């Protein structure tokens, strides 16, 4: 009998637009007509959330089903789903409000402008034990740059090269500016209440960092880890592989907390660890897998690609025990051939336009939605 897997789910943001890659905002209309879709402050992107699933077969179908539904709605209007995590061909200087009457959206536009008009995927892992949850948040905060590097898909902005592999993370307003590594649940509660009192956070959701604890009544009632750093990963096999990588890393922590919790096993102070994690994230946003990072254990320099490979090799026996070895294999392909941003930049350097890359990517997304791993959705 296989060990139990964690519950997990996705929060997926998507851009809509023309097959040629230009952004066209229809989020308000979609949210009114299609259950399960919600608007973002800008109408050019929208969001859906999957229900928690332990099974990766069911999780993959939960990921793809809303995309198919949305695609059917878009097609008669000559629109499609677009890859990428920034306004690759869109007007990045102009905000297009999805709800002009919403005061919170007014605040977002006035404070951040189009820096928040991005597409991403947040990965949630169910963890109800507070001690384990905060240990996992600490570890994944210190290794979040690895997951950003695997997912990077935003090398373009406004029809130009951005100079970054993840322009989304480069421009996204981390809020508050400095977030500590939380020692425990009480530390987190006290810190959030202090941020709310000073106005550094406008509400309990206004914690925009690479990873955070989440739950039905933040900051008090928590039941999951939310990884927020990843760019949009449109290939379901790649996203599932990244999720398996994340889950197996947390599983290793559960089995070896004293060795893998940075609070217990790092030579650095918590303040230094927080600074190191943020610096690694910034380095990964620039050149992703080629970035030189610093390891949380002792601050030593290590290439991002090499660090991921070390972890991958260490977790493959556990992946086999959980029946997840095949699901994990796309990580090796990403390390060999590059993430979406790197592959796009290689093809762009050969003379292909951004429009052509987005058009090909949109077609690939549609083809990927026809593939179901494991059982047929009709049986579920």
What is each model feature region?
Residues 88-90, 154-165, 262-271:
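Short proline/glycine- and acidic-rich turn/helix-capping motifs at secondary-structure junctions
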Residues 85-89, 129, 231-233:
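Active-site-proximal loop/turn and secondary-structure-junction residues that shape catalytic pockets
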Residues 7-15, 40-49, 78-89, 113-124, ...:
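Core alpha/beta catalytic barrel or barrel-like domain that forms the active/cofactor pocket
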